Regions:
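Acidic interaction surfaces
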Residues: 1-116
Length: 116
């Protein structure tokens, strides 16, 4: 059993990925947003067990930063936490892959092996 304060956990996660509260563009999910100050007011008053069991914090909750990076809630085997996702940018150089159909491969680079 590990009781944590959600506000402290969130601030720690933000600092761990070299961001600040004022870097936040929005908090919510793909359909809803919450006021940033209101979010932290509620988070600071929320203590929960982040260990094994059912998820206490919504798993679709995201903090999106102005540069496109994000923190997203993640749950694995009953343990829940923030997971960092860097912003997506187009690579400056890349290799092309051939494709004639999608198969049951896991990665794009493997598609070259299945071109018939």
């Amino acid at each position: 059993m590990s009781i944590v304060n959600f506000g402290k956990e969130t601030r720690f996660a933000i600092a761990t990925v070299d961001h600040f509260i004022n870097d936040i563009a929005w908090i919510g999910n793909y359909n809803f947003q919450v006021d940033i100050d209101e979010f932290f007011k509620v988070a600071d008053n929320t203590n929960y067990d982040n260990g094994y069991g059912t998820a206490y914090i919504p798993v679709d909750l995201m903090i999106v930063f102005k540069n496109g990076d994000s923190l997203r809630r993640f749950e694995y085997d009953g343990s829940e936490y923030w997971k960092f996702y860097p912003s997506l940018t187009k690579p400056t150089s890349f290799r092309h892959f051939k494709i004639d159909k999608f198969t049951d491969v896991k990665y794009c680079e493997k598609l070259n092996e299945y071109v018939r």
